[in-house]
């Protein structure tokens, strides 16, 4: 414990945090430094990596999530399981929720980019999923 406290005190960058004994200038858990909003962070670093399909209706504030997912699909990126993605832009919230439900029923991981109002509007689609 004394080694870690001395590494913190001798950190020349002036930043606080736990450092490793082998490299006193670097934090133990440096993370990824970037500037983005919540839509960008979740879509780029989570949803495009773990899902098989992104189904959405472009409506503010969730439009950006669908656009980023489409860019990932267009560039041919694979998810962490090595599978290609599908990006589907629907004509309404009902269609988007129905598409995401159908995708999930077939055993695929799907994301539906929507807003609070979109969830309420497409609530009828939730009742179709059980029993299918």
What residue ranges belong to the model's regions?
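Thiamine diphosphate
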Residues: 2-132
């Amino acid at each position: 414990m004394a080694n870690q406290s001395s590494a913190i005190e001798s950190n020349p960058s002036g930043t606080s945090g736990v450092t490793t004994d082998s490299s006193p200038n670097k934090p133990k858990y440096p993370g990824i430094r970037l500037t983005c909003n919540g839509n960008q962070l979740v879509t780029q670093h989570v949803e495009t990596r773990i899902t098989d399909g992104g189904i959405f209706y472009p409506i503010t504030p969730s439009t950006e999530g669908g656009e980023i997912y489409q860019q990932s699909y267009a560039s041919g990126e694979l998810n962490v399981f090595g599978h290609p993605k599908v990006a589907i832009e629907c004509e309404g919230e009902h269609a988007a929720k129905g598409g995401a439900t159908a995708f999930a029923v077939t055993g695929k991981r799907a994301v539906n980019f929507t807003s609070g109002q979109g969830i309420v509007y497409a609530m009828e689609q939730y009742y179709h999923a059980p029993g299918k």
